[in-house]
Amino acid sequence: MSKGPLFVNPGGPGGSGVDMVRLAGDILSKSVDGFYDIVGFDPRGIGASNTIRCFKDGTESKFFMANRNPVLSPGDNPSNHAAWLKAQANQCIAKNKDFLPFVSTAAVARDIDSLRDAFGQELTNYWGFSYGTFLGATYVNMFPDRVGRVILDGVTDPTTFSGELVNWIKTSLIHTEDGIDEFGASCEAAGPEKCALANPDKALAFDGQHYVAPTVRKYLNELITNPLLLSNQSTPGIVVQGEVANAFFLSLYKVANWPKIAAAFAEAIEYSIGDKLHDYLVEAETDRCPLVEDYTMSFIPVLCIDGTHADQPDLKSYMKGLEDASKVAPLAARLWGTAMMQCIYWDVKPAERYTGPWNQATKNKVLLIGATGDPVTPVESAAKLEVLMEGNGVFHKHNGWGHCSLGQPSKCTIKVIRDYFVDGIVPEKGSECAMEDQPFQPTASLQSFGDNGLSYQELSTLADAVHYAQRRV
């Protein structure tokens, strides 16, 4: 017998819950033993839900995008990049000015409650990933008496997300460099048969103990002035440093992707060819067909409206804040920061914005999951939210790399999730699951995960669906 709808959100902000369920709804259902009706929804302004369009059609959008590289590489003039973003912001605001004040997270939380009511349910069951945890935290504190079973997986700090943008970037990326170091160390431990970069004779750098991570960092620096050629594409082209850095950064989200990105770097370093790196970036888009062609940005409106930017009112002060964040995460802060720079010019005030409190007494306890090696939603954020919720949330520590618990799944955490949703078992304070396999050496890859029989491949597919929905932003 169904326990009712389980609403899911992949994050972003701007991720499509519809695409997520379309791609992996069967796996989500299997993870909860089929006891819930899995419901994905596109939040306001996203996907099939009154998409915010800045251009007339996809052709016009692509023509505009062709005028610049979406990723700012070191050495690029930020003023030129900012001018492009300002032009885009002006266009988007002009075309959507009447609707934009109503796309805040608080507005979407009210929509979730309307969905609950439409399904005839007394309580809301919800599973949110990444930014979806901010949406979930907002909902459970706006509607605490309607909280059923709610899991927030890959928690972003709600106090910084709703605060100054650059500070949120800085505090979100505190483990990104740790992930790069682990990528290198585990590659070396796995050896050349499992990791193409595990060859000290071809290393570009050595720090006295390791060579893979130093090689990757040095190579990314060399690409600033030496872009890669594409040799096997239908048309000639190059891959610039910002794109390669972005490909590597995205690989940190899912440990199962590490062998593939290592092979791409090995090819590029040895032959100065960027085809595998280019293919890594475009693979997710060519393998799937979204229900709605997204002609514009989808994450910028929510990101800029939910936060405050008083300390970064202009490009100069924003770049200073980004420079401080880059001391914590030299690679990722620049990638995130230049993508989010548009908030400087996003002059839209939300009709409603929720910034706390975060300690409302919820009808049921919320499960908060944080992965110890998460590159963008640090485990500390889940622990902090547990404190902020003052007994209404329980933090479960998932020892693993990658983004959210799906970045490097374990039988233990899958069982915690299943037991919470299906049997209503809330883990004890201090709940923790150990890492069950090592990067590049997935001993669990041929095993099923828990009583529900989920396979490692199914969980990998689910992670791809979540990350695909996020990457459309």
Per-segment meaning from a language model:
Residues 252-257, 373-376:
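Acidic catalytic loop of the alpha/beta-hydrolase fold
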Residues 264-265, 417:
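Generic hydrophobic alpha-helical segments
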Residues 277, 282-307:
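Long, low-complexity segments enriched in small/aliphatic residues
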